[in-house]
């Protein structure tokens, strides 16, 4: 009887350890990476959050984003080339429209950046810088963060394609998310 209890405790400990290891792996894998590398991606999502004091409705405006070619260097052991113009471009703005009967403490909208694999001439990792464009909406603060975005260009039988995009803020992988 004691042996059965010990076996159950050991099994429970092993299962707990396995769950902890698998959960740790999930947090690493949940990094802000778009694409699986095997298929071409066409867009990179960008999120905009407007925080309020809870007494203001969503602003009736949109927020746009800017993309600039980044410089050469290294990222995660890969040689990185400067971005190629047109490989990553601002596409859809994050649009807000007042609605509802109760103001919220924050409002979130999504925009996107367009990916164009046809502009690349060789496989590799390409670097871009993404920022929020400052606007003139009265009383609005704009996020001055800069994200490094790395596009991974692969070669297949059908030619070059962008299979992954990784966004980084202050040296850490992070979703492309701007907050006022």
Question: Where are these predicted regions, by residue range?
Answer:
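Solvent-exposed loop/turn and edge beta-strand elements of beta-rich ligand-binding domains
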Residues: 2-180
């Amino acid at each position: 009887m004691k042996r059965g209890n010990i076996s159950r405790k050991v099994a429970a400990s092993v299962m707990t350890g396995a769950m902890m290891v698998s959960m740790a792996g999930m947090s690493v894998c949940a990094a802000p990476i778009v694409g699986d590398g095997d298929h071409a991606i066409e867009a990179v999502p960008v999120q905009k959050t407007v925080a309020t004091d809870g007494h203001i409705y969503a602003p009736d405006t949109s927020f746009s984003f800017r993309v600039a070619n980044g410089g050469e260097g290294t990222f995660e052991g890969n040689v990185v080339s400067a971005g190629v113009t047109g490989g990553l471009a601002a596409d859809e703005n994050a649009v807000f429209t007042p609605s509802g009967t109760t103001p919220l403490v924050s409002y979130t909208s999504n925009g996107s950046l367009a990916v164009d694999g046809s502009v690349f001439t060789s496989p590799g990792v390409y670097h871009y810088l993404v920022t929020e464009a400052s606007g003139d909406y009265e009383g609005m603060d704009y996020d001055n963060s800069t994200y490094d975005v790395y596009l991974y260009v692969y070669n297949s039988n059908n030619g070059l394609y962008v299979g992954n995009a990784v966004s980084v803020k202050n040296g850490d992988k992070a979703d492309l998310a701007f907050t006022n």
